[in-house]
Amino acid sequence: MSITKYPMTVQGARALEEEHLFLSKTERPRLSQAIGEARELGDLKENAEYHAAREEQGMVEARIRDIEGRLQNSVVIDVTTIPHTGKVIFGTTVVLANTETDEEVTYQIVGEDEADVKQGKLSSGAPIARAIIGKEEGDTVVVKTPSGTVEYEIVEVKHI
């Protein structure tokens, strides 16, 4: 059985590590204390504070395990250490110009967990990312989106 490794940027790995640290060093002890205090209140069957703390503890522990799994099954790619060739690869930041409207957009190609279109971070599996990965500055690509077909020119590829 082979385990699939998932690409992740340095920033994405750092964010998960920080969340893991917060959950394990701050939230876990806080919830343990809250459960202990709720136990002291007596009958656990009808103790809402106890049940709420236990439920939250379960969610925190599940998230900690999820983060640990994601970090174990990731390949962290530092795009700043890769020679700049003008080619779009995982981790690069790409400036695209809509050939019809000349409107420019900037996206960084990131892992699935890091994607946030509002912050300009596209999952490597997104239609636009799939269309531009492997292409170079000056290339034109046609992207099929839910709202129709859009043609972009790759204006600039940055390793930042």
Swiss-Prot record:
Keywords: Coiled coil, DNA-binding, Transcription, Transcription regulation. Residues 53-73 form a coiled coil. The keyword Transcription regulation applies. One of its GO terms (biological process) is DNA-templated transcription elongation. Necessary for efficient RNA polymerase transcription elongation past template-encoded arresting sites. The arresting sites in DNA have the property of trapping a certain fraction of elongating RNA polymerases that pass through, resulting in locked ternary complexes. Cleavage of the nascent transcript by cleavage factors such as GreA or GreB allows the resumption of elongation from the new 3'terminus. GreA releases sequences of 2 to 3 nucleotides. Gene3D superfamilies: Transcription elongation factor, GreA/GreB, C-terminal domain, Transcription elongation factor, GreA/GreB, N-terminal domain. It comes from Pseudomonas putida (strain ATCC 47054 / DSM 6125 / CFBP 8728 / NCIMB 11950 / KT2440). The gene is greA. The keyword Amino-acid biosynthesis does not apply. PANTHER family: TRANSCRIPTION ELONGATION FACTOR GREA. Belongs to the GreA/GreB family. One of its GO terms (molecular function) is RNA polymerase binding. This is Transcription elongation factor GreA. InterPro entries: GreA/GreB_C_sf (IPR036953), TF_GreA/GreB_CS (IPR018151), Tscrpt_elong_fac_GreA (IPR006359), Tscrpt_elong_fac_GreA/B (IPR028624), Tscrpt_elong_fac_GreA/B_C (IPR001437), Tscrpt_elong_fac_GreA/B_fam (IPR023459), Tscrpt_elong_fac_GreA/B_N (IPR022691), Tscrpt_elong_fac_GreA/B_N_sf (IPR036805).
